[in-house]
Swiss-Prot record:
Family: Belongs to the GGGP/HepGP synthase family. Group II subfamily.
EC number: 2.5.1.41
Protein name, entry field: Geranylgeranylglyceryl phosphate synthase
Record's function text: Prenyltransferase that catalyzes the transfer of the geranylgeranyl moiety of geranylgeranyl diphosphate (GGPP) to the C3 hydroxyl of sn-glycerol-1-phosphate (G1P). This reaction is the first ether-bond-formation step in the biosynthesis of archaeal membrane lipids.
Required co-factors: Mg(2+)
Domain of life the protein comes from: Archaea
Binding, sn-glycerol 1-phosphate: 172-178, 203-204, 225-226
Top EC class, one word: transferase
GO annotation, biological process: glycerophospholipid biosynthetic process
Subcellular localization: Cytoplasm
PANTHER family associated with the record: GERANYLGERANYLGLYCERYL PHOSPHATE SYNTHASE, IMIDAZOLE GLYCEROL PHOSPHATE SYNTHASE SUBUNIT HISF/H IGP SYNTHASE SUBUNIT HISF/H
HAMAP family listed in its UniProt record: GGGP_HepGP_synthase
Organism: Methanococcus maripaludis (strain C7 / ATCC BAA-1331)
């Protein structure tokens, strides 16, 4: 049985095709002000991704609330096998390709697969790549990431190419939540050129100017999380920069 591209992924592909780039906002369900964040971003984000540790409030309840508040596609970004709920629209079905621990490469997604099928969730097959300085962040520590050095962009490119050969349609270049600096432009460009699949970039993107650069370098999706928690109003300017970069990129590509 061949898994077909679902409604959420089709919608996202259309946004990328028409706008040149999409903007995802990451909401940690453990944040007490997740309702406030959802209200602030609903008119600016193209999709919401939910990820992080789960505290007192259940993931089911948080996901349902965020869907009701925003009216946007809600995509799970699970930190482990328990980070799945039937209330979501889709899930980033991912492998942390450069983890030193096979649990994060293959065991965790395998353990979660039956639950995802049971819930009827749409899957977005994705390679998750930990990029320097991710080892200094929580995800780098927990995921035992063998981080890809920023000065070796070709390594990320080859991983991305490998992901495309495995049939994945998305690559997430992740510097880590609250990272000191983002994934560099050359690495984004090489990853896009070699793989030809959708490139998501997150971690350390704090200004609209940096987001613009990342899109022009080849990013199809920009993700912000920590920024959104600290300054929900910043998403308005971030969206403007991402969409401007997307249109500028489309114009540039049309001339080639």
């Amino acid at each position: 049985m061949q898994i077909k591209i679902g409604e959420v992924e089709s919608k996202l592909n259309k946004i990328i095709e028409e706008d040149g780039a999409a903007y995802f906002v990451l909401i940690d369900p453990d944040e007490k002000n997740y309702r406030e964040i959802a209200n602030h971003v609903k008119n600016y984000a193209d999709a919401i991704i939910i990820g992080g540790s789960i505290g007192i409030i259940s993931l089911d309840e948080v996901t349902k609330e965020i869907k009701e508040i925003t009216g946007l596609p809600v995509i799970l970004f699970p930190g482990n096998v328990d980070g799945v709920t039937k209330e979501a629209d889709a899930v980033l079905f991912m492998t942390l390709m450069n983890s030193k621990n096979t649990y994060w490469n293959m065991t965790a997604p395998t353990l979660g697969a039956l639950t995802i099928k049971k819930y009827g969730l749409e899957t977005l097959p994705m390679a998750y790549l930990g990029i320097e300085p991710i080892s200094k962040t929580a995800v780098g520590f927990v995921g035992e990431v063998n981080e890809i050095p920023q000065k070796k962009p070709e390594i990320a490119g080859i991983y991305s190419l490998s992901a495309s050969y495995f049939g994945m349609r998305w690559v997430y270049l992740e510097a880590g939540s609250g990272a000191e600096y983002p994934v560099n432009n050359e690495m984004i460009g090489i990853s896009k050129k070699l793989s030809g699949i959708n490139i998501i970039v997150g971690g350390g993107i704090r200004t609209p100017e940096v987001a613009y650069e990342k899109v022009m370098s080849g990013a199809d999706v920009i993700v912000t999380g920590t920024l959104t928690e600290k300054d929900p109003e910043a998403v308005k300017e971030m969206k403007k920069a991402i969409k401007k970069a997307g249109m500028d990129k489309l114009k540039m590509l049309s001339k080639k």
